[in-house]
A protein has these predicted regions:
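Short, electropositive alpha-helical surface patch
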Residues: 152-165
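Short, conserved beta-strand edge motifs with alternating hydrophobic and charged residues
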Residues: 48-50, 99-102
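C-terminal helix-cap and adjacent tail motif
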Residues: 3-13, 86, 165-196
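Arginine/glycine-rich "motif VI" loop of SF2 helicases in the C-terminal RecA-like domain
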Residues: 39, 133-135, 161-163
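N-terminal amphipathic, basic helical "cap/leader" segment at the start of enzyme domains
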Residues: 1-94, 196
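Helix-biased detector of long, well-ordered alpha-helical tracts
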Residues: 17, 86, 102-110, 193
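Short coil/turn connectors at secondary-structure junctions
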Residues: 94-97, 137, 162-166
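Small-aliphatic-rich amphipathic alpha-helix that forms the alpha element of a beta-alpha
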Residues: 33-34, 99, 105-154
Length: 196
């Protein structure tokens, strides 16, 4: 699969086969993520990969608990989308692997005040997602674990150092056979581009 095919094929997957991804493939995903550009080549990120059933099930419970926090937003959605999200948040959509992306806190540093390292992290995540697509995997970027109590519990579960902070998480897995992604309308090019 070439790059353009991977870009066009990539979408959020919210239903997965209950199949473990081999560690070798996960390492390849992180290797590809680490090739992304970052300001001053700092690569201020660390990937915590939850790939064991026991810890995965604990993480699934954490995500399910965020449904209560999002109740108002979910109730505003149309019925089919509401059903998809409730199922997704109830069991990670069946995904067996969750990758948590952390960064090292850099206190009293100008870089900490500006989003340079966040841009680098985002580039790394996109590399990871495109790499996953090229290997027949699906991904879904989720930020719901940033709720303070859940983040604290996650840090304890994964033995995260105090000088690291959670940025986001990505589910990775084999898309469920017959899965049809939600069709999300993208902005028209004229809305996001301006030639000067």
């Amino acid at each position: 699969m070439n790059l353009q095919e991977a870009i066009n094929k990539r979408h959020s997957v919210r239903e997965y086969e209950r199949k473990i991804i081999p560690k070798k493939i996960l390492i390849e995903l992180i290797k590809d993520a680490s090739k992304a550009p970052s300001a001053k080549n700092e690569q201020n990120y660390k990937f915590y990969i939850v790939n064991s059933k026991k810890k995965r099930d604990i993480v699934a419970k954490y995500l399910k608990s965020t449904l209560k926090l999002m109740n108002k937003q979910i109730n505003k959605l149309e019925e089919n989308l509401k059903k998809v999200l409730i199922n997704f948040y109830s069991d990670l959509g069946g995904a067996q692997t969750i990758i948590f992306v952390y960064r090292k806190k850099i206190k009293n540093s100008p870089e900490y005040q500006f989003p340079n390292d966040l841009a680098g992290i985002s580039c790394a995540i996109e590399n990871l997602m495109l790499s996953a697509v090229s290997r027949g995997l699906g991904t879904c970027w989720i930020g719901s674990f940033k709720e303070p109590k859940i983040e604290k519990d996650l840090n304890k579960l994964m033995n995260v150092k105090e000088d690291e902070e959670l940025i986001t998480s990505i589910l990775v897995g084999y898309p469920k056979k017959g899965y049809k992604p939600l069709i999300r309308k993208k902005k028209k090019l004229k809305e996001i581009i301006k030639f000067i």
